Amino acid sequence: MAPADLLQPLEGQRAETLRLIESLMAGDLDVVVRGDGRTVQQLLCHLVDREHGINFAIRRALEGEVLHLSQEEREQISRSEAAPAPAGWDLLRIRTELVEARESLRQTFLLMREDDLDRAIRWPEWPARTIRTSIPYMLEHEDSHLDELRAAIDRERKLVS
């Protein structure tokens, strides 16, 4: 199987995320998601940020460099993810950013050969140690946030009606 073919489950998951975005209204972006208190907008922007970060780590691995983040660097990532979502990122912008982030990841995978999938990669909080073994974590990450988003929107709509 070609490396880019391994993105099919991720692309299916992204299609679900995009369908959710299409069902949202502008006011839904301010709904608070249970858990860490982020809003729908912040969580969607987090998906964009995380995908760019993963793509960066994979590209470094393809160049023979394994990222090793210090505790301080990990904490900095956590702080930046907790920061307010970019001002002016409406539903259309978020959708566009998610599509572009996935296309960028796809381009990275198109550059790979089969043996590249076994290159070392490290990403904070994931036990995966190769590009190949990171793919299920990428899928689970977006899927779990999509569940949180759906629950928050459903809860909010029940309160309003």
Language-model features, listed with the residues they occupy:
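Alpha-helical bundle segments that constitute or directly flank the non-heme di-iron/ferroxidase center
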Residues: M1-D28, V48, H52-R60, Y137-E140
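Alpha-helix N-cap/loop-to-helix boundary motif
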Residues: A2, P9, G35-T39, H46-R50, ...
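A short, mixed-charge helix-start or loop-turn motif at secondary-structure junctions
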Residues: M1-P3, A83-G88, P127-I131
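Short hydrophobic/aromatic segments of transmembrane alpha-helices and their interfaces
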Residues: G12, A26, V99, P127-A128
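Acidic/histidine-rich alpha-helical segments that form the ligand environment
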Residues: P9-Q13, S78-D118, S134-M138
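Short, contiguous alpha-helical
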Residues: D30-I77, L117-S161
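A structural signal for long alpha-helical coiled-coils and helix-turn connectors
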Residues: E22-M25, L62, R113, I153
